Amino acid sequence: MRELVHIQGGQCGNQIGAKFWEVISDEHGVDPTGSYHGDSDLQLERINVYYNEATGGRYVPRAILMDLEPGTMDSVRAGPYGQLFRPDNFVFGQTGAGNNWAKGHYTEGAELIDSVLDVVRKEAESCDCLQGFQITHSLGGGTGSGMGTLLISKIREEYPDRIMCTYSVCPSPKVSDTVVEPYNATLSVHQLVENADEVMCLDNEALYDICFRTLKLTNPTYGDLNHLVCAAMSGITTCLRFPGQLNSVLKLFAVNLIPFPRLHFFMIGFAPLTSRGSQQYRALTVPELTQQQFDAKNMMCAADPRHGRYLTAACMFRGRMSTKEVDEQMLNVQNKNSSYFVEWIPNNIKASVCDIPPQGLKMSTTFIGNSTAIQEMFKRVSEQFTAMFRRKAFLHWYTGEGMDEMEFTEAESNMNDLVSEYQQYQDGTAEEEGEFDEDEEWMR
């Protein structure tokens, strides 16, 4: 029933994806060879959301791995769960995109895209009732951003009524990987606004901060960052994989979280995040988890929710707890911090409870927020974009692959429109008409 197809693209997407399958397999009791060694029927009840069952009771991830160079694929294959994936589902080129969006979207990526789509079709056709696609990729590089968005638009053409959910690692303000990140990210956002249904924004700097400040790690590795992301990804899909009380399909997320079709960029958070030494000093209670998941320090993207207002939010609690207490806490949050929620959407926090906690925890919670503060991230990228584009820096790399300057201008204005839309709903109030009348009186 209700299957998902998972696609990972580029170096970043493949590394996050590989970690994600480790976490998910652990939760469903699937070992690195694909055999089931779990201890509960619940692990198998909806295992087909993410796995196909092969001969001999072997579980194979419904995952498609793509990249324009073989390097990352090889390391995934050599990793702990490398033998889990179906060999036909590795699709890679040899040239690499060289951090160039145009190469991923128009030249190198376009040559490889048909073989990726064949695998996507094969996986989609073997589903009973496909509910959608999830894609992990980054927006700053070439493959994940350029080819990732190309794939998203192709899937959109072929499966227009299926949900498209992306986990996108956005360029972070201080941790920069390449100089052309602002170009790649802006061109990608231009595509994601039109073709994706839900975009979970992540970024390395915010993840580093969580590792330093909250988890007290002295030198966090990418493995640690990916682990954080996967904890949240696993939490978001919990209600699809285990019996729960709300949000059991991806479409319901969209319905509950997106008030206007273009505003589908979410912040995600996870709790409990405690450093190894201080776990015994904290109680895992619903109020504690609620307080921690709304904490600005727990957000996995570099935007501060205190600088904006929440349009909507969803919280997925896991573990044995009373639903009544969860509902009370949600009301409590809205009443105490009412200025941080727009007043023209009543009860804008949705909560769901799933009885099965993640490995090694009694209870946990994952948070998805649609906050107007996400515009900070777009503004930052947009400023860097404008600074470079004004001088036409590095443009020849893109025009050389057949792109037009017009596309850059369009992407820039689309991003700026997005920022001003968020700002408009942040400032908007429920009694706008009444307020204008008073202002006019005062003017006279």
From Swiss-Prot:
This is Tubulin beta chain. CDD domains: beta_tubulin (cd02187). Signal peptide: none annotated. The keyword Cytoplasm applies. It comes from Phytophthora cinnamomi. GO terms for biological process: microtubule-based process. PANTHER family: TUBULIN. It is found in: Cytoplasm, Cytoskeleton. Coiled coil: none annotated. GO terms for cellular component: cytoplasm; microtubule. Keywords: Cytoplasm, Cytoskeleton, GTP-binding, Magnesium, Metal-binding, Microtubule, Nucleotide-binding. Tubulin is the major constituent of microtubules, a cylinder consisting of laterally associated linear protofilaments composed of alpha- and beta-tubulin heterodimers. Microtubules grow by the addition of GTP-tubulin dimers to the microtubule end, where a stabilizing cap forms. Below the cap, tubulin dimers are in GDP-bound state, owing to GTPase activity of alpha-tubulin. Belongs to the tubulin family.
